[in-house]
Amino acid sequence: MNNKALVVIDLQNDITKNYKEIIETTNQAIDWAAANNMNVVYIRHHNLSAGTRTFKPDTRGAEFVPELKIVSDHIFTKTKSNALTSEEFAAFVSAHNITEFFIAGADATACIKSTCYNMTKDGYAVHVLSDCITSYDKKKLPEMLEYYASKGCTVDKLSEIM
């Protein structure tokens, strides 16, 4: 494996139904990453807050969406927005000397935003795959793409990097 990783964030059953618009391209990104000897990593969210019903551990809602292609056992669980708060994921990044990330998944205004911000703050190269992310509020996607760029991420379509 090289020092790059595709990170697929929170494509779980409780996520927005808008994921259906990006699942084909996301699966293409997974194939591309695997073919290029990149680490393919899956992040799932577990909501431990008592007052909420989504992303609860051991529920169907917390499972990955059935259409998502799983090509590795690099599956990590987070309980906060930023994927790097998962100690297991952070240890994996360190152990594999990963310095460059390609980001896919949801939600563009929450977990992807926090993860990208913190990755760039920590000095990693971050590429947001604009046709592999979505949000509950798709009207905010253009604003989020500008935000990612303003924080040091590159924003590319999958076809531009393949």
Language model: regions and residue ranges:
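Active-site-adjacent betaalpha module
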Residues: M1-A5, E24, Q28, W32-N36, ...
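Short, conserved beta-strand edge motifs with alternating hydrophobic and charged residues
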Residues: V7-I9, V40-R44, F76-T77
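Active-site loop/turn elements of alpha/beta-hydrolase fold enzymes
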Residues: L11, H45-N47, D131
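Short acidic, Gly/Ser-rich segments with clustered Asp/Glu that frequently serve as metal-coordination loops
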Residues: Q12-N18
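Flexible, glycine-rich phosphate/dinucleotide-binding loops
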Residues: I15, S49, S135
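Flexible, glycine- and charge-enriched loops at secondary-structure boundaries
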Residues: Y19, I23
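Von Willebrand factor
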Residues: A33-S49
